[in-house]
Amino acid sequence: MAFDLKLTACLLLAVFSLAAAADCECQPSDEGHDAAKSRTLKVIAIFCILVGSSAGCAIPSLGRRFPALRPDTSLFFALKAFAAGVILATAFVHILPVSFDKLGSPCLVDGPWRKYPFTGLVAMLAAVATLLLDTIATGYFLQRAQDSRGAVAAVAACGGDASSSHDHERGNAHGVSSAVIASATMPNDAADDCDDAEDRAKLVRHRVISQVFELGIIVHSIIIGISLGASESPSTIRPLVAALTFHQFFEGIGLGGCIVQARFHLKSAVTMAIFFSLTTPVGIMIGIGISSAYNENSPTALIVEGILDAAAAGILNYMALVDLLAEDFMNPRVRKSGRLQLIISILLLVGIALMSLLGIWA
């Protein structure tokens, strides 16, 4: 289901981009344009961003080989705080101001776009929609997990072979690990049942978080890629290559951390990582394909990109503050350690500072 949502989002963004290319009223200036040099820089950008995204997403998964990077270590908490700071600055410093500029552009008619702060409205609604999706999806998958656990326990209680039931449920639990379902076949006292239920709830929550988080990243990554790919100005593209490579690298660390905590099967984890890594490069290729007809100042392009930027900012704000920072800062291990609180607070501020600094070039 999550993969279908991501694929649908990408297709809709591509269609909107083509529509924007056909509607050109405010014509851009050709000053400083160099198609040949721009094309070379775009190819370099595709390669650099692909490598940066993949490397960032892969770092948290190294915890299987390096114990210091496991989800329960101080280093992992610090990395997540740093990545959350990057994501927060991305939303507030990079995406939200761009949306305000686009929806307030003089190329748009005076009403209603330039008379009402649609950027704030869309960002707020996107954050609320993310909250509702987060809550509903978590509740749904938890219920599925409880139903699956009850079914397996019933088979075990009747003296039957639970393995066939376990195999069947493994393909349908959507967010429940095989270990969690299998644990239902073993006798537990009340305390063990409580701990098991808590672990199961955390697992489901991490899986929902990682999927909603990736959906938010996809929205703004496609737009960024299309904008870069459609540009014919080397002076515009050159600083974006380095800025976007670092941007995608840090976002990859955040997403990779969520994927590791969600304990997806290897195939699902690799699919999510590949999808994230390819999103911006695919956007660049779409931009290259429509660059001859695309006009970033057309009303359609400004409205569509402005609304999607605002929605992406709202989603990322919610994910960074609620699902990443609040969850870690409220973690009992963090609350009991003043030293760890200080470390992740500093790393959070460093992430915010570095990503805000990139706003000078991107």
Swiss-Prot record:
Residue intervals on the Cytoplasmic side: 64-74, 142-207, 261-269, 323-341
What topology in the membrane does the UniProt record assign?
Multi-pass membrane protein
Q: Where is the signal peptide?
A: 1-21
Gene Ontology CC terms, in alphabetical order? plasma membrane
- Side Extracellular, residues: 22-42, 96-120, 229-239, 291-301
Q: What are the TM regions of this chain, as residue ranges?
A: 43-63, 75-95, 121-141, 208-228, 240-260, 270-290, 302-322, 342-362
GO terms in the biological process aspect are: zinc ion transmembrane transport
Give one GO molecular function term: zinc ion transmembrane transporter activity
Report the locations given in the UniProt record.
Cell membrane
- Coiled-coil spans in chain: none
Q: Which UniProt keywords apply?
A: Cell membrane, Ion transport, Membrane, Signal, Transmembrane, Transmembrane helix, Transport, Zinc, Zinc transport
Indicate whether Nucleotide-binding appears among the record's keywords: no
- Signal recorded as keyword: yes
Q: Which family does it belong to?
A: Belongs to the ZIP transporter (TC 2.A.5) family.
Which NCBIfam families does UniProt cross-reference here?
zip
Described function: Zinc transporter that may be involved in zinc uptake from the rhizosphere.
This one is known as Zinc transporter 9
